[in-house]
Amino acid sequence: MSNIAHTLLLFVREQQLAQDLALIGTCLHSLEAGGRRPVVVYNQGCLSNEQAFEQLKPFHLEFHLIGKGENTGTTVGRQACFEYILQNLPDVAYITELHPDMLFTPHWADVLAGYLDQTDEPIVSSGIVNRSGVLPFADRSAELPKQGGLSAAFLDSLCEDRIVHGFNNPCMHRAQALRSTGGYNPSFLTGMSCFEDDSMLLGYYYYCGIRSGWRPKVNLNAMVYHATASQWVGLGYNQMDNFNGLVRQYGAMGLKHLSELHQSPWHRSFFLGRYEQLAAPAGN
């Protein structure tokens, strides 16, 4: 049994069925090159579980299909995947979060697992290159191949022997740490998406202890293609539902700590501004 398990939310739109299935197929084809590992797939629609399993069968991966084909949002879907692994796959040491618009090299997960083996980090992210050729945490860009598609060799050519401050998906959790923090809490995060990653980062920040000065890290020795980090934007969901839940869960100081945890200037400014609004004396 592999000590790495992947999680994937299967969100197929009826009006873009062929396009979404092709995207997922390309993703899984690249993932199977890394070996036959468990992949817990949460079916969020519009396929029935029987239809979804038929789409997954061609790939040489150990699929565990959960969910009922209903779009329950990121928090519920991911948390269900985590709980399934922790309850049913006890030998798994590391758990990833994948998106269907990703392409992988055969060894990207081994690189991240090797890093976690050698450190006490609760989580680590892979480096990414997006559809515009931007490598966000490497502070540079690359020209994407115009012919032949995105190969593993091309992604490997973008790697650096460097660990930097930051967070993105795909990420890999240490299962023991995830069990301790509880993962995502749908009782607070009642929205469809947004800010669930911030909740998770705060959980790890407190897990490691404030004195440790822990910051999330990106390992640029592994590189993954991630077309876009905002699949849920523009789908009509209220992004502030989860923000309000984040505040209920962690309070104003949680926002202050997030302004220090994030690498991105936008996130730092956003969370600090919200903290200052809440901390301002009444009537100001």
Regions found by a protein language model. Name each.
Residues 171, 177, 181-182, 189-220:
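A short, conserved alpha-helix in the catalytic core of glycosyltransferases
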Residues 14-33:
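Short, well-formed alpha-helical segments that are part of the catalytic scaffolds
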Residues 141-164:
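Short, flexible, basic/aromatic active-site loop/helix in glycosyltransferases
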Residues 124-140:
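Short beta-strand-to-loop element that shapes/binds the nucleotide-sugar donor at the catalytic cleft/hinge
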Residues 28-66:
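Acidic donor-binding segment of Leloir-type glycosyltransferases
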Residues 91-103:
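Short beta-strand-to-loop acidic/aromatic patch adjacent to the donor-nucleotide binding site
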Residues 213-238:
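Active-site donor/metal-binding and catalytic loop motifs
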Residues 68-86:
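Glycine-rich, basic loop-to-helix element that forms the pyrophosphate-binding segment
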